[in-house]
Every structure is written in C-alpha cells, then in structure tokens.
C-alpha cells in the first residue's frame, strides 16, 4: 500500500520505535496521520508537522485499556473528520513483568479492543469499506525471552490474534499483518523488570548482543506497510525485514 495520500491512525506513535516510524511515515506523504497516545508530546508532534508540512498530523490522548465503547466514541470523532481511514497501526506496549495485569491489558487486550472498535466502521458486513491493520507484536511471540514470560506471552497472543484477523479478511474485508521487532535499542529495553526478579540484569544481558536502532526498525516498518501483504508475519531484526514462514502444527479444518 502506497502511503501517499492515505489516512493513517497510529496508536502509540510517539514511543521509541513509534516516533521514528511516524517520522518515516510523514516523509512518505500520507494525507493524514492521526496519533493516539497515552502521553502528549507537543514537541514531537511539532517535529512531525515540520518534516512534511503537507501532511496533517493530529493527536488525541488515548489509553488502550479503556473499554471498547470509549474507543468507538473516539473513532467516531476521527472518522467524522477524515471520512475514511486506510490503515490502523496498533503499537502500544510495555515491558515490565512486575505489572502482570497491565502488561496483558496493554500488549494484548488493548490491541483486541482497538481492533474490535474499528470494525464498527470497516466491517464490510456492516457496509464498511474494509481496511488494513498492522499490529506491532514481537519476535518474543516466536520464541520467548523466558525471563519475561508475561511480556512474551502477551506478544504471542497478539501475534495469534493478528494471524486470525488475516484469515477473517474474506468475511470482514479487513486485512492484517504483524510487525515483529527484534531487540531494538529503546528506553523499553535499557532496564526492565523480569518476572519474580528471576534475572535482574535481563535488559543489560540482551544489550550485550547485536541489536538494531529504532531508525532501522522504522525504515523496515514502512517497507512492510508498502508491501501490504495480508497475513504476513514480518520479522524486523538487525536492520533486516524478513517474511517469516509460519510452521503449522495443527489445523481446525474449518
């Protein structure tokens, strides 16, 4: 999907990977970039507007843990202004296995709820035009960082949800793919809590191995958006974009 002249909603578009991705997106010339984030960052919004003044960049405060009804209300406001939305990026995430309930609420339930809410506007069974969803998951959804099992499990759940969305596209008209970054040098991984403090140095240990920058990840993210492949499982690791071939071990046959 060419980004030029598209309307894009980016949940958590002001974080580490999120902000660099927002920068790369505005360079590609969408018509509108709507950023939904828990924390306002006027400086970042001003920077995005300055990168490409032809792009309309707007911000709405948003916490992905709110009920679906509240998200739907916010989306009604956005759709009323834009008329159409082409792409939803679900990017909210936390890495802190001390916060078990919040990790699941942000990393998994929030993605499900935001997706559920936008279906009210996109689902072709309701007369909607369809749309595209890019869910930011993680390579830990493939193989866990076992010292942070709650985080890893939440990302595996988000990946499974995304794979199902892609299979449902013939019914809903909404396509989906997952973005799975490897270890990326962001504040998220510099220091974080392992589950039950099983490894207090887990963040430091990860950074002793090869990593990637947020810019490298963001540039490959834009390439994945442009590829627009329904059901794709994109691995963004060490500056490379790799299409993962998922191994099927079981099938429901329905």
Swiss-Prot record:
CDD domains, alphabetized: ADH_SDR_c_like (cd05323)
Highest rank taxon of the organism: Eukaryota
Binding site for NAD(+): 10-33
First-level EC class: oxidoreductase
Record InterPro entries: ADH_Drosophila-type, NAD(P)-bd_dom_sf, Sc_DH/Rdtase_CS, SDR_fam
Binding annotation for substrate: 138
TM region positions: none
Pfam families according to UniProt: adh_short
Residues at the catalytic site: 151 (proton acceptor)
MF GO annotations: alcohol dehydrogenase (NAD+) activity
Record keywords: NAD, Oxidoreductase
EC number in record: 1.1.1.1
Reaction(s) catalysed (UniProt annotation): a primary alcohol + NAD(+) = an aldehyde + NADH + H(+); a secondary alcohol + NAD(+) = a ketone + NADH + H(+)
SUPFAM superfamilies named among the record's database cross-references: NAD(P)-binding Rossmann-fold domains
GO biological process terms on file: alcohol metabolic process
GO cellular component, one term: cytoplasm
Family recorded in the similarity comment: Belongs to the short-chain dehydrogenases/reductases (SDR) family.
Subunit structure: Homodimer.
Descriptive protein name: Alcohol dehydrogenase
């Amino acid at each position: 999907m060419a980004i030029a002249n598209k309307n894009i909603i980016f949940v958590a578009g002001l974080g580490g990977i999120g902000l660099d991705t927002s920068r790369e997106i505005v360079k590609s010339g969408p018509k509108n970039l709507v950023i939904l984030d828990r924390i306002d960052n006027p400086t970042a919004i001003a920077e995005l507007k300055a990168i490409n003044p032809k792009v309309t960049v707007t911000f709405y405060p948003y916490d992905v843990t709110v009920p679906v009804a509240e998200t739907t209300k916010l989306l009604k406001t956005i759709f009323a202004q834009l008329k159409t939305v082409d792409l939803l990026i679900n990017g909210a995430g936390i890495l802190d296995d001390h916060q078990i309930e919040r990790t699941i609420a942000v990393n998994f339930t929030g993605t499900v709820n935001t997706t559920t809410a936008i279906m009210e506007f996109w689902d072709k069974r309701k007369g909607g035009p369809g749309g595209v969803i890019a869910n930011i998951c993680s390579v830990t959804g493939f193989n866990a960082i076992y010292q942070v099992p709650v985080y890893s499990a939440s990302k595996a759940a988000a990946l499974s949800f995304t794979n199902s969305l892609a299979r449902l596209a013939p019914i809903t008209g909404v396509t989906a793919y997952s973005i799975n970054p490897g270890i990326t040098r962001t504040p998220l991984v510099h220091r974080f809590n392992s589950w039950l403090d099983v490894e207090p140095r887990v963040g430091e240990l990860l950074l002793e191995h090869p990593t990637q920058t947020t810019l490298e990840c963001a540039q490959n993210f834009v390439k994945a958006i442009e590829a627009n492949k329904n059901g794709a499982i994109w691995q963004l690791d060490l500056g490379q974009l790799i299409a993962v071939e998922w191994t099927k071990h079981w099938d429901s046959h329905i």
